[in-house]
Amino acid sequence: MPSTKTKENFPIVISASRMCDLPRWYPQFLITEIRKRIENGQKIHSLVIWTKHPAALLNSRLLDELVDLKNSGVQLYFQITITGMGNKVCGYDKLQRPWKPEPNAPSKEESLRILPQIISLAGHPQRIRLRIDPILQVNDGKQEYYTNYEECLDTVEKCASLGIHNYSFSLVEPGIYKKVDHRFRELGIELIIFEETFRAKIKQNFNELEEKLGVSISACCIKGWPVSSCIDGELLQNLHPSKSKVSLRQPHSRPLCGCTASIDIGGWPPKLCPTGCDYCYARPLYHSYTDD
C-alpha cells in the first residue's frame, strides 16, 4: 500500500509587521487581528512584533493585551530597530533644510532607555532581535558625507551589555527600490553604494564585535553575506517556555531571506506609516519640511 503522510498542524507564528509599525500607529488593529485569530480557533505559537517605537509596547491597553497573551502561552518576540538616526538631523537637503531620515522615530537614547522594560516584557533578552537596520551613507545637499555606521557599532556595544545577543543589519543603496531612489532624488541627497573596501571593513568590525561581546550580527538579504533568519522557527522553538514545535518551512519570500513561515498581519497594500523614514520601501508618510 502507498504510504500516507499526516500533515502536521503546527501553531502559527504571527509577524506584526514588516511593512508598518503597528504598535505605534495601529495598536488597536494589532489587538483586533490577534484576538480574531484566537476566536477562530487558531493556536498562536509566537507573536513577533517589529517596531522602532519600543515605548509604544508599554502603552497601557496594548501592554495589557500583550501580558494576557504571554500568560496564555503565546511567546512574545520583539524586533526592535535602533539605527541612531531617530529624530536626528543627519545633513541638509537640496534647499539647505535640516534633513532627518527618520523624522518621527524616537532618538537612540530614548529607545535604549526603554529596552530594559521590553526585556522584562519578553521574559528574556534572547527574545529580542536588535535591528541596526539599515546602514546607509550619503552625500547631502551641501555635499557633506554622512553615515550611521559608527552609531550602529555603538548600539551593539550598549545593547550587548543588556544581554541582547542577536542583531540584524541591511544596507541602503541606490538601485534596489525605485521608490527610495526617487525620494532621495527629490531631497537632493545622494545615496552612496557600499564599495568592497567598506563592506570588508563592516565584516571585519562586526566579526570583532561578535568575538568581543559574544553576540551574533547577521545581514538581512545582502549579497555576499550568509543567508540569515530574522524569524527563526528553530530559535522560537528553543525559546518557547513549553518548547512547542513550529513550522521550519522557509517560504523564501525575498532573495537571500532565510526566514521560516509566519503570517504577516500588516495587510496589503501596506498601511500608511507616519514614522516617515526616507529609505522605507513600504508605504511611508513622508515628512514635509514646509513647517520647519
Summary of predicted features, one role per range:
Residues 196-258:
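A C-terminal junction/extension of Radical SAM enzymes
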Residues 285-292:
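Short cysteine/histidine-rich zinc-coordinating motifs and their immediately flanking basic loops
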Residues 263-264, 268-285:
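Local cysteine-cluster metal-coordination motifs and their immediate loop/turn environment
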Residues 7-191:
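Conserved AdoMet/S-adenosylmethionine-binding subsite of the radical SAM
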Residues 56, 225-227, 287:
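Flexible loop/turn segments at secondary-structure boundaries
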Residues 132, 169-173, 215-229, 269, ...:
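Acidic carboxylate-rich catalytic motifs and surrounding loops in phosphoryl-/glycosyl-chemistry enzymes
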Residues 1-7:
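Short, compositionally biased "basic patch" segments
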Residues 125, 149-169, 233-261:
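Structural recognition of alpha->loop->beta junctions
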